[in-house]
């Protein structure tokens, strides 16, 4: 009987389930969206029951579309939107909505903590204190949900990120992995344990915390009434770390970029815990008794800039049109677009930056705007890669995400980086990474060497641009960024006058 691995890919807007075989081929997919809830401006929540319902339906659809029986599934891997914070009781019943990673309700609280404890938090967790991470969200829940802190003190509350909630519902086990724990701002990435000083700082009782395990081991077995079989749940990693694993980036210096609404770039630093002023240090995964680390750069707006061309100023109807428009021009004739709609992420970290389009003349048309948008994505990626290069030597960039279908963008990315950009055959690298981690735990795959041999390039984009042109274009980009930075402060100052 042929066996398969099931990957659960729980994102910010939808829950997906994908079934892979030993050669990494996809046999079945299920996907269901779930609603976002916005109770106040800047607040973002999910209903955990809606997440669970969407995930369970996606699993059943994937099994059905693959035309297999549940007992043909050798293992289940979980990957998830990171940082999103949930609390539930011992019966698995949610005690409040999930507070989503995008939610800014704790921004002021974190700013106060950052002023006094920012350096200490960065040294312990590798993270720059921000409302993005789980610690302040959990503190808010304990302080604001009636009766929750009292229940927590009695050991009746369980906290976790989305992976932990799904694994608890599937198996009854309260666990997470190193990669997800490292995004809570409560986990000491050197000691590999919850940090007492941080728990005290955020006033969080240890009893609510899950057990932290490796990213590839059997955490438990699915309850038979759910799927009709007891299947080992044996892989767990946050979405960006799972994508790094799915790209078979197992050695130091191997880097991947995921192009989505924003972009995330991770470089494997292996056993080295490296610190950068402008990048996050995080755990990539725990495997076979050792932990691998990574540096991460988060870019807030990339694909969202293309969506703005479509939905905001309506100069395109489909994202794919940008490639055709961009290739109509031999050059962009000095037009730059800095898509700092919500500030700039790595390596600038300027929340007061705002979007600008600069270099416009009477001859500027929608071709220039489309091209400037795609070029901005590549420039922003180079900004992060250059920062990584200060600490780690980088030879090539492996890419995934929807925008990788755009050949103009991929070629320009190779040109502006002066490095190969490699697009893999299997585009579902996040789900594939979780599947690999699950399969390794049950000997479905032997080791990472076998997985590295399975990874195949669909196309390699070689740099073609001469150095003089490349550096002239990039210098123009850096000048454009300077003009975008701090713009919200300029506007506020003008208002107050």
Curated annotation (Swiss-Prot):
ATP binds at residues 12-14, 261, 303, 307, 402. Pathway: Polyol metabolism; glycerol degradation via glycerol kinase pathway; sn-glycerol 3-phosphate from glycerol: step 1/1. ADP binds at residues 12, 16, 261, 303, 402, 406. One of its GO terms (biological process) is glycerol metabolic process. CDD domains: FGGY_EcGK_like. One of its GO terms (cellular component) is cytosol. Sn-glycerol 3-phosphate binds at residues 12, 82-83, 132, 239. HAMAP family: Glycerol_kin. Homodimer. This is Glycerol kinase. The gene is glpK.
